[in-house]
Amino acid sequence: IYRLPREGMSVSRPRRSQCPGCGTELSWIENIPLLSWIVQAGRCRSCSVRISLRYPLVEASNAGLWYMAVTLAGPADWPLWLCWSVVLSGLLVATMVDFDCFQIPDEVSLGGCVLAPLACLCVPGLQGETLLAQFLSAGPQGGVDRVGALLSSFAGMGVGAGVLLLIGALGKRIYGAEAMGLGDVKLLAAGGGFIGPGGALVALALAALVASVFGLLNMLRFFILSRSRARGRGRSVGIGRSLRVARLAGRYLPFGPFLGLGIGIVLLAWDDLSILWL
């Protein structure tokens, strides 16, 4: 999360993690998730600079996602829960980076587009509940073979990318500005590769619903903030102007986190959602 959006850094470069304050390379014992932060009281051992609470929170969230995947898939079905866990970790990375930088790393989105068909080919159960995968499979009725899962994965990527490109084109034509970033397009394409075309549409619907709620709350926050700042400066600001400020400032939210949430929900709960969707 820290490295991917920064120029000159990658997952493998530098080879070892460094203190964000003094740049000292961290030993393996200082890199144990959660435990190292607790033992060191949230500070660097070299310069004593405070290490953000965000690090252990993200590590705990990732552990929780893996636990959820194992629980829902069943410990015995390790290929399925391992694939789910990797996807969920990628979505967590995309979410945090998009919140910070309003961009989604290609390592996550394009990497997911490459990984999705390979994973579905090896673990057809990833597409096991999608009607398209069942229809395209030559196996027993209701079952999914490798070919069906692979074709459904490609269809999911096409639908995921296509629908967002269409929305972006329509938005640009209507509003005269970019309505959808390519990072979001690539992320939903990658997600569609794991959850199929129907899953991609459901994930987008969930993302739009949650994003709308958060967008309204964010605009309300800016409306209240605008009014309170005006009062603090002894100025009178009309409600109309406060509404314009709220609309302009509050509508800018990264869409990637909401897409990640939608994809994650569909990935883990497609059985229940497909019944409601159909």
What are these regions (language model features)?
Residues I1-L278:
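A membrane-topology feature that recognizes alpha-helical transmembrane segments
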